[in-house]
Curated annotation (Swiss-Prot):
Protein name: Homoserine kinase
Source organism (scientific name): Mycolicibacterium smegmatis (strain ATCC 700084 / mc(2)155) (Mycobacterium smegmatis)
Family membership noted in the UniProt record: Belongs to the GHMP kinase family. Homoserine kinase subfamily.
Gene3D superfamilies hit by this protein: 3.30.230.10, GHMP kinase, C-terminal domain (3.30.70.890)
General function of this protein: Catalyzes the ATP-dependent phosphorylation of L-homoserine to L-homoserine phosphate.
Reactions catalysed: L-homoserine + ATP = O-phospho-L-homoserine + ADP + H(+)
Organismal lineage: Bacteria, Bacillati, Actinomycetota, Actinomycetes, Mycobacteriales
Keyword rRNA processing found: no
BP GO annotations: threonine biosynthetic process
Catalytic activity, EC: 2.7.1.39
Enzyme class: transferase
Recorded GO CC terms: cytoplasm
Database matches in PROSITE patterns: GHMP_KINASES_ATP
Binding site for ATP: P95, H96, S97, R98, G99, L100, G101, S102, S103, A104, A105
Pathway of action: Amino-acid biosynthesis; L-threonine biosynthesis; L-threonine from L-aspartate: step 4/5
Length: 317
């Protein structure tokens, strides 16, 4: 039986950006970045009000189709609750449609905020495994969602639904990140969507290409955790980055320049952002100057934390 939450409850969640694939780990590897969105949810007598500040303001819908609202409704349903009405406030720092996991952050943040609401009604919160499952059902793959839930670097996988149907099972485990590794996201003004770039990928790949990526993905786990000196070889990919290059030539060119400068650069998710991984303390001047001159915002970030939620409206400064 569904319970109705009382009026006057509030909850806050803070959720990180993420970069998926990391080169060879297509739909499997991901890492959280220290760039965060904040969601504050309140239960009210009736209706729905959505406020958006920062990224996406004036561009995203402010009704039931808003991704955060959809995630909240899914989380409430999974927990056996409904809300009489909601006020949802989103403070967004994660760029949209840039390959930095903004949609995964919206979903994970919405689900986590539900934890803050239902615990005030005497219910147990959803654990990380449940958050990964529900958020990945939105995404269709768990790499960004798992990184947003767990923080740090993750390896995720999908077990297909059985003969009787149902959702696939999504899971993830954390990867210990070597302390010397630095993250350098480069974000262009250009936008892109995962759906648009996935159609560029072939339905089938050769055994040679599959073997190449399998070896690099396995090596990348070692490079991330123990051997940063192997990052250049470990981030090579033949399954998706070359195929997407024509749709984002500026990103492909900057990726190549970073790699020529010794930075293990990859497309961030489906692009168009580029992520550099390095044990160096900064980017070479040539790489930084090229990025700035060609419209990329290049920064150094630390690894992001896992999603945090609390009962009550706790707004960050």
């Amino acid at each position: 039986m569904t319970q109705t939450l009382p009026v006057g409850l509030s909850a806050t969640s803070v959720v990180a950006a993420s970069s998926a694939n990391l080169g060879p780990g297509f739909d499997s590897l991901g890492i959280a970045l220290s760039l965060y969105d904040e969601i504050v949810v309140e239960t009210v007598e009736s209706g729905l009000t959505v406020h958006v500040e920062g990224e996406g303001a004036g561009q995203v819908p402010l009704d039931q189709t808003h991704l955060v609202v959809r995630a909240i409704n899914k989380g409430l349903q999974a927990a056996g609750f409904s809300a009489p009405g909601l006020v949802v406030r989103c403070r967004n720092d994660i760029p949209h449609s840039r390959g930095l996991g903004s949609s995964a952050a919206a979903v994970v943040g919405g689900l986590a905020a539900v934890n803050g609401l239902v615990t005030q009604a005497g219910s147990e919160p959803m654990d990380d495994a449940r958050l990964i499952q529900l958020s990945s059902e939105f995404e269709g793959h768990p790499d960004n969602a798992a990184a947003a839930v767990l923080g740090g670097a993750v390896v995720s996988w999908t077990e297909q639904a059985g003969a009787f149907g149902g959702e696939p099972r999504y899971s993830a485990v954390p990867v210990r990140l070597h302390p010397d590794i630095r993250l350098f996201p480069a974000v262009p003004q250009q936008r892109s969507s995962t759906a648009e770039t996935r159609v560029l990928l072939p339905e089938q790949v050769s055994h040679v290409d599959a073997r190449f990526n399998l070896s690099r993905a396995a090596l990348l786990v070692v490079a991330l955790s123990e051997r940063p000196d192997l990052l250049m070889a470990a981030t090579e990919d033949v399954l998706h980055q070359p195929q997407r290059a024509a749709a984002m030539p500026a990103s492909a060119e900057y990726l190549a320049i970073l790699r020529r400068c010794g930075i293990a650069a990859v497309l961030s998710g489906a692009g168009p952002s580029v992520l550099g991984l390095s044990a160096q303390s900064g980017l070479p001047a040539e790489a930084l100057e090229y990025g700035t001159a060609h419209g990329f915002t290049v920064t150094e970030m630390s690894v992001g934390a896992g999603v945090r939620w609390t009962a009550g409206a706790v707004v960050r400064n």
